[in-house]
C-alpha cells in the first residue's frame, strides 16, 4: 500500500513538473531587460587601465555629454595609464611660446588656467569626430592634429609608432586604447 502511495505521488509530481515546464516554455521572464551596446562614456568609465584619461575627460562637461550622446559617432583615442607615466612632459605642464608648444629646460611656471587649457587641448587631440575609422587613411582630431591610421599585418598603429592595444565598440562610436599619448609634435623625443 505504501509503495502504491509513493508511486502515485511520484507520478503526480512528475506530471505537474512536466506541465509546468511546457506552459512556461512560451512565457517571457518578467524582468527581461533589453541588451544594448554601452556608450563611449560607459566604456571609458569601466576600462580599468584608462583612469587618468577618464579623469581628464570628467573636467569637461561638454565632452562628457558628447560621449553620452546616442546620435554622435566618434572615435576616442585613449592613452592607457602606462602611457601617461612614460610622458616626458605631462599634458598640463606644457609651455607655449607664441602659440607653439616648446620643451622647456627650466622649471615651467604655468597658471592653473594655463594648465586647464593645456588639458583641454590634450583631450581634443585624442578625439576624432567620425566612426568607424578606416585603415590607411588620415583623420583630423578636434584640435586639428593630423592622425594617420595604419594597419600592419594584424596590428593597428597611429602615426606609425603609437600602437592601438585594443578597440572597443560602443553604440555611439569606438574607443581605441593606446600605448602612448598623441603628444604635442614640437616636444616629442
From Swiss-Prot:
Keywords: Cytoplasm, Membrane, Nucleus, Signal, Sporulation. It is found in: Cytoplasm; Nucleus; Membrane. Residues 37-182 form the FAS1 domain. One of its GO terms (biological process) is sporulation resulting in formation of a cellular spore. InterPro entries: FAS1_dom_sf (IPR036378), FAS1_domain (IPR000782), Mug57-like (IPR040200). It is a peripheral membrane protein. PANTHER family: FAS1 DOMAIN-CONTAINING PROTEIN YDR262W. This is FAS1 domain-containing protein mug57. It comes from Schizosaccharomyces pombe (strain 972 / ATCC 24843) (Fission yeast). The gene is mug57.
Amino acid at each position: 500500500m505504501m509503495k502504491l502511495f509513493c508511486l502515485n505521488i511520484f507520478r503526480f509530481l512528475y506530471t505537474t513538473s512536466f506541465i509546468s515546464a511546457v506552459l512556461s516554455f512560451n512565457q517571457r521572464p518578467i524582468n527581461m531587460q533589453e541588451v544594448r551596446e554601452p556608450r563611449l562614456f560607459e566604456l571609458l568609465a569601466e576600462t580599468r587601465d584608462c583612469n587618468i584619461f577618464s579623469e581628464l575627460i570628467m573636467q569637461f562637461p561638454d565632452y562628457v555629454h558628447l560621449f553620452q550622446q546616442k546620435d554622435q559617432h566618434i572615435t576616442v583615442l585613449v592613452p592607457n595609464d602606462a602611457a601617461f607615466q612614460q610622458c616626458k612632459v605631462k599634458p598640463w605642464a606644457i609651455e607655449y611660446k607664441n602659440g607653439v608648444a616648446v620643451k622647456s629646460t627650466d622649471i615651467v611656471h604655468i597658471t592653473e588656467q594655463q594648465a586647464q587649457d593645456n588639458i583641454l587641448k590634450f583631450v581634443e587631440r585624442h578625439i576624432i569626430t567620425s566612426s568607424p575609422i578606416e585603415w590607411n587613411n588620415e583623420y583630423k582630431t578636434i584640435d586639428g592634429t593630423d592622425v594617420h591610421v595604419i594597419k600592419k599585418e594584424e596590428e593597428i598603429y597611429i602615426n606609425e609608432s603609437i600602437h592601438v592595444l585594443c578597440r572597443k565598440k560602443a553604440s555611439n562610436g569606438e574607443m581605441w586604447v593606446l600605448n602612448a599619448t598623441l603628444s604635442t609634435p614640437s616636444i616629442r623625443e
